[in-house]
Curated annotation (Swiss-Prot):
This is ATP synthase subunit a, chloroplastic. It comes from the Eukaryota. PANTHER family: ATP SYNTHASE SUBUNIT A, CHLOROPLASTIC. Keywords: ATP synthesis, CF(0), Chloroplast, Hydrogen ion transport, Ion transport, Membrane, Plastid, Thylakoid, Transmembrane, Transmembrane helix, Transport. The lineage of its organism: Eukaryota, Viridiplantae, Chlorophyta, core chlorophytes, Chlorophyceae.
């Protein structure tokens, strides 16, 4: 037991303590958390909730304005879920995939468009929630839990037969594939958003007037692509777990 702790558990704790830059720490129930991430995450959640309330407070048979935009986004998310998960199962996963897509999109755009770094805090600096590895890992783990839940809910313990298909010797590869999915999801999103904000920050410091604007517009585009990729992969993983293998 002691050997297991030294070999596996302790290294995991060391990895979890790795961070990029300085952070504004809060202590909650004896645990230190990144306060700046909570602040920007609450801002993003508040923005999304406020938009939803305003856009849908007075629904009309013929949508217009914000209601029309809200319905377009909902239809887009529904089509995305239908394409990735499949016609039989997609409806129950529209809320999850939609929440993931909207949260990641608004978080990314907040980093590309808002001057977070101009707001002073006691330590560290504000940035997009997806600029922090803890946020992207949490989203990736939620996705992993969801596709395991989807597969077990539909197939029961028979879901785990997929690890020995089409041949038993593929078991290690199939297990490794499942554990690599959250890693690839989290590090792809974190790396792209961090790199984008660093590039914009450097250009603003060097040439603060015109040059950063095209880069910021490019950041808006790539941020949307990253949100779409994350939501698409989440839907694809769920669809893969519920599909019937013959």
């Amino acid at each position: 037991m002691l050997n297991l702790q030294n070999v596996i558990i302790n290294p995991l704790f060391e990895i979890s303590e790795v961070s990029v830059g300085e952070h504004y720490y809060w202590e909650i129930a004896g645990y230190e958390v990144h306060g700046q991430v909570l602040l920007t995450s609450w801002f993003v959640l508040g923005t999304v909730i406020l938009f939803g309330l305003i856009a849908n407070k007075d629904l009309k048979p013929l949508p217009e304005g914000l209601q029309n935009f809200s319905e377009l986004v909902t239809e887009f998310i529904r089509d995305l879920a239908k394409t990735q998960v499949g016609e039989e199962e997609y409806l129950k996963w529209v809320p999850f995939i939609g929440t993931i897509f909207i949260f990641v999109l608004v978080s990314n755009w907040s980093g590309a468009l808002l001057p977070w770094r101009l707001i002073e805090i006691p330590n560290g600096e504000l940035a997009a929630p997806t600029n922090d590895i803890n946020t992207t890992v949490a989203l990736a783990l939620l996705t992993s839990i969801s596709y395991f839940y989807a597969g077990i809910r539909k197939k029961g313990l028979g879901y785990f037969k997929r690890y020995v298909q089409p041949a038993v010797f593929l078991l290690p590869i199939n297990v490794l594939e499942d554990f690599s999915k959250p890693l690839s999801l989290s590090f792809r999103l974190f790396g792209n958003i961090l790199a984008d904000e660093l590039v914009v920050g450097v250009l603003v410091a060097l040439v603060p007037l015109i040059v950063p604007i095209p880069v910021m517009l490019l950041g808006v585009f790539t941020s949307a692509i990253q949100a779409l990729v994350f939501a698409t992969l989440a839907g694809a993983y769920i669809g893969e777990s519920v599909e019937d293998h013959h």
